[in-house]
Curated annotation (Swiss-Prot):
Signal peptide: none annotated. HAMAP family: Ribosomal_uL16. Keywords: Ribonucleoprotein, Ribosomal protein, RNA-binding, rRNA-binding, tRNA-binding. GO terms for biological process: translation. This is Large ribosomal subunit protein uL16. The keyword Hydrolase does not apply. It comes from Pseudothermotoga lettingae (strain ATCC BAA-301 / DSM 14385 / NBRC 107922 / TMO).
Amino acid sequence: MLMPKRVKYRKQQRGRMRGEAKGGTTVDFGEWGLKALAPAWITAQQIEAGRIAIMRVMKRSGKLWIRVFPDKPYTKKPAESRQGKGKGNVEGWVSVVKPGKIIFEIAGVDENTAKEALKYAASKFPIPTKIVSRSNIGGEAV
């Protein structure tokens, strides 16, 4: 699973996901990309599931870039514990994804394979996404 090697503080506040993504909104490395259309926390497990789905379709051809990294810890209190007594333990890591952010990029495969792979990866995420190409940044909704 993806997670930071070290962090300055173990726990973070939740924060808010307002507005659109500031950076990472264009396909910079590959030919095809998967773009988020809504804000969400994407967990390390969801990123890994998407990566596996893409690699399963592409087999051993092509190259994949993961453009998001889960650097925010999220906490959870144990089941059946009363409120209070401090913040819960770190349960996992998430990446804060805002609308417009490119999540995955792929290259080295034909158009049909790229679209099929990104469609499978899109099904692993809790948000609507669209497939975009380097030339056509408008894309098609998935």
